[in-house]
Amino acid sequence: MTIRILPARLANQIAAGEVVERPASVVKELVENSLDSGATKIDIDIEKGGAKLIRIRDNGSGIVKDELGLALSRHATSKIHTLDDLEAIMSLGFRGEALASISSVSRLTLTSRPATQEQAWSAYTEGRDMQVKLQPTAHPIGTTVEVVDLFFNTPARRKFLRTEKTEFAHIDELLKRIALSRFDVSITLRHNGKVIRQYRAAHNDLQAEKRLATVCGQAFVRCMLKIELEHQGLKLHGWITTPEGARQQSDLQYCYVNGRMMRDKLINHAIRQSYETSLKPEQFAAYVLFIELDPHQVDVNVHPAKHEVRFHQARLVHDFIYQALASALAQSDSIEQPQINESAFHYQAEPEVAPLGSFPAESNEVPQAVYHAIEKAPAYPRKAGQEQQLQPVAPLESSFSSEQGREVAPAPHNERNAWMESRSPARHTTSSNQSERYGEPAPSKQQVKAYAELLHTPDFPSQNVECHPSPSIASPVQELGKAVSVVAQRYLLTTTKAGCQLISLARAEFYRILGQLNGDKAPLKSQPLLVPLSLKLEKGLVHAAQEHQDRFARMGILFKMRNEKALMVMGVPAPLRQQNLQLLIPDLLSYAASQAQKEEQAKNDTAMAQWLALRVAKVKSHYTLSEAIQIISELEQLWQEKLPLQDAQLVTSVDFSATIAQLT
């Protein structure tokens, strides 16, 4: 067969297969064109569920006579002209396919009058004849698009249309989404001559709440929490409901990116995760959320219906949404505190340590496997019987004696497993009825790994440490010697002028963290949290935070008191940035309260730094030579001439004289 260029009519009908799925698709494209034209009033008339008639009238800028025929041509648009325009797109439409595709499967009349014309003009075309017929007509400033007999020339497509009631329900739901995205636009919907919906323009908060109540119901308004947050060019605002406003189906989930309706799986995953600890498996969150960001940071041209986008900084967007919602839910009085960092429940191996002084920027690239995993992820929320937790690695026993404090390990493993068990009903059994009900298998290990790759934030890495070397010393004091080899995977053999010595890397790790937390020379710099962490505590713990507020501030831990039983964590030092603050801060306040009566210790920040170092430092099963060199190099730089060489659990001399004697 020879290769030929497709006729324009056939090409448009093929394109219509993607653009025009059902009458609601036509309404979506035409209403979005009205919004792009600056309309503040849109009237929609539907007959027979849209199969007989779809008429959209607006008061937008209109189309001049000379461009009416061109507007019905394929790939003709006023929205973009260059690639730069596409990369900075803010309009809802930009492909120039909608009108041509719709006219190829219907009888379409386009009537318009811009403010610069005294006469309105009408363009008519239908599927079999792509010729456009122009004629003068009467029309106010704005545009009217009339679509008659949808799919009249494609019987196979028309046969797949549902009942009139079903098709109109899709149109009604679509207009609800549009009404929530543009509170400043009046929208009227009629079906078979009867007014069904009338959304009046909202110009203040009270009117906006009325529209919310009209679309989402009074129950949503009673249980809603207002969200408004901005960080690093990202802005999130809108409303979410407390768990009391949870639904039995996902019918009140509306999300918008730069004003565009979205069903993006990355966004949905962040929202699901923020509600994970507060909703039952059969419950669904309800929300109306708006995400705004630089259009250069998002690609909207990745989905035929524009329902999904790709974020250039997907990790940042995901964590921003998750922490914003989790913090808002934690601050509400109706639920317990959600666990912000579940990865802290399990021991995890430490990643490779970068060279000292290296501060690599966090990569925002999301591997393709992540998107594949998200595509195959089970529907929200996690169903009973589905296992999604990564298997924990058993923590190592501490090498520290009981006299030196608590073990360097995560909080009690059994308690955390019990907590996770209580949040995952029937996690060990999955009945056949459940499989039939949900119809989706649990994610595979590869999918879970891909999720972890997207969401995992490693425990505090050494490359993010803010070191405070003494300004009086030009270079670190080399007292630990030259590294030779790692012995028994956890000890480093070094050589000095005095001979050989063995260094415990686990103990060195403790002193490294202690050096980072030691604020004797200068107060530690506090790093503000992306979203302040709200904690509900006992009165005694809040009192301890107030009593030792200056002491905590010197360590870079900043609190803001809410009331006698609640406070907010505003900032922490770099070594604590990636810790599970939801667990660590209450324990720290308990420690401070217990030491209050010991006057000398209460005034000594070193004791608190030692306690924190024991909690934060991690014990590894084995170290590489490069990791060992990194640890002792930072140790020497942090401690300078004050290296704790007197600690026998840190360093001990090794005498090879007897061994050498046997060889001679």
Curated annotation (Swiss-Prot):
Q: Which UniProt keywords apply?
A: DNA damage, DNA repair
Q: What is this protein called?
A: DNA mismatch repair protein MutL
User: Which residues are listed as membrane-spanning?
Assistant: none
Pfam families on file: DNA_mis_repair (PF01119), HATPase_c_3 (PF13589), MutL_C (PF08676)
- Tell me the organism: Vibrio vulnificus (strain YJ016)
Q: Does the keyword Amino-acid biosynthesis apply?
A: no
InterPro entries membership = DNA_mismatch_repair_CS, DNA_mismatch_repair_MutL, DNA_mismatch_S5_2-like, HATPase_C_sf, MutL/Mlh/PMS, MutL/Mlh/Pms-like, MutL_C, MutL_C_dimsub
Family, per entry: Belongs to the DNA mismatch repair MutL/HexB family.
